[in-house]
């Protein structure tokens, strides 16, 4: 006897997971990031006014510190920003699609061999960090018959990127590669700007001045990052590169002047009561000393909450700390809700993981890192919501 096979008709994807509808992805994920574009713009204006008459450029590398360059860069442009810094060429290519043509896009890591034409096609301005990068960019300029815009970076003490100071004469030799390069900016980067009294700041500025003595007149100069802006006007030169301060992060005294930009919440998946002696999480790293009420939150180390926070971190609800219990997993973490009224939290509710009660600086201290990393490592599964 044959059995009639029923044809399988899957439901439309939209009916199951309406992720393409604005604001709906958060209904189906474990957590959400709320980014205030208005606060980003306000922070830009604060720093712009602070450093005037120097220009204020925005550092939006690493997807605007993980918060979404596609939304943040246009908001900064609308606030008056016209110069943007990224780390890699592909980031500049992506921004070129969404920013007007008068936005200058600087690529801090310079150019990989063979990437010169792609940079030219994207209208990017490479930050040239070596003789080889200068020579490669100049070869393309000679091939197209005109000098090509670039920035030139010198290493004054960071030991990371840039030509050594002794190459200043080479870099600006009118018979050398500079003949086919249009220098838009000469820059260096401060290593200890977040320690205002450190003697290294003055040493780097003095080294920068010696380099500038070789430079042609009229080329813009840049030394300060967010923290460097608070070292005094001698460090501002013509342009400051502002990153952390835009996002409300601790960059020396600027943190007190900046508006908070980001909040992260996690969704309660389940609550439970456990008896004394119950193990919690992988390895039973925690055993309940007495009866406890626990809530499982749909955020884990894949979303930016690393395992090293397991024993020290926590969430917040209505201003009250909810300590983490047991080891943080890839997709979830557990908090102690024993101090809350029994019905205070239920499945679907949100707890604060990052915000006014759990600041980036607190998470950085607990995780033995810096607040920049706390923001930059936020996972792509967290739904990003933007408010103006």
Describe each PLM feature range.
Residues 3, 8-41, 45, 49-51, ...:
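Active-site anion/phosphate-binding pocket segments in diverse small-molecule metabolic enzymes
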Residues 25-27, 31-42, 52-214, 218-222, ...:
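Active-site-proximal beta-alpha core segment in soluble small-molecule metabolic enzymes
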């Amino acid at each position: 006897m044959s059995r009639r096979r029923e044809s399988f008709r899957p439901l439309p994807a939209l009916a199951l997971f309406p992720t393409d509808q604005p604001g709906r992805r958060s209904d189906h994920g474990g957590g959400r990031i709320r980014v205030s574009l208005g606060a980003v713009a306000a922070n830009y204006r604060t720093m712009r006014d602070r450093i005037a008459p120097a220009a204020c450029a925005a550092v939006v590398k690493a997807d605007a510190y993980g918060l979404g360059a596609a939304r943040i860069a246009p908001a900064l442009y609308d606030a008056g920003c016209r110069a943007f810094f990224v780390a890699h060429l592909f980031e500049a290519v992506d921004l070129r699609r969404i920013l007007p043509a008068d936005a200058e896009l600087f690529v801090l890591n310079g150019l990989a061999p063979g990437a010169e034409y792609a940079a030219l096609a994207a209208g990017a301005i490479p930050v040239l960090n070596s003789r080889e990068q200068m020579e490669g960019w100049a070869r393309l300029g000679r091939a197209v018959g005109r000098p090509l815009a670039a920035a030139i970076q010198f290493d004054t003490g960071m030991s990371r990127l840039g030509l050594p100071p002794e190459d200043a004469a080479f870099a600006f030799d009118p018979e050398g590669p500079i003949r086919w390069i249009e220098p838009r900016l000469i820059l260096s980067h401060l290593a200890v700007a977040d320690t205002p009294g450190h003697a290294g700041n003055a040493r780097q500025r003095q080294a920068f001045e010696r380099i500038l003595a070789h430079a042609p007149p009229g080329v813009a100069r840049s030394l300060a990052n967010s923290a460097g802006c608070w070292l005094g006007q001698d460090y501002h030169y013509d342009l400051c590169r502002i990153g952390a301060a835009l996002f409300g992060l601790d960059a020396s005294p600027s943190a007190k002047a900046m508006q908070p930009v980001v909040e992260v919440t996690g969704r309660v998946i389940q609550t439970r009561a456990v008896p004394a002696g119950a193990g919690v999480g992988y390895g039973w790293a925690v055993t309940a000393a007495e009866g406890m009420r626990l809530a499982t939150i749909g955020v884990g180390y894949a979303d930016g909450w690393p395992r090293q926070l397991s024993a020290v971190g926590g969430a917040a609800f209505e201003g009250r700390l909810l300590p983490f219990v047991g080891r943080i997993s890839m997709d979830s973490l557990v908090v102690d809700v024993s101090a809350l009224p029994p019905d205070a939290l239920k499945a679907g509710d949100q707890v604060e993981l990052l915000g006014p009660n759990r600041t980036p600086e607190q998470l950085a201290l607990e995780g033995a890192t810096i607040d920049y990393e706390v923001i930059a490592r936020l996972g792509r599964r967290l739904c990003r919501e933007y408010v103006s």
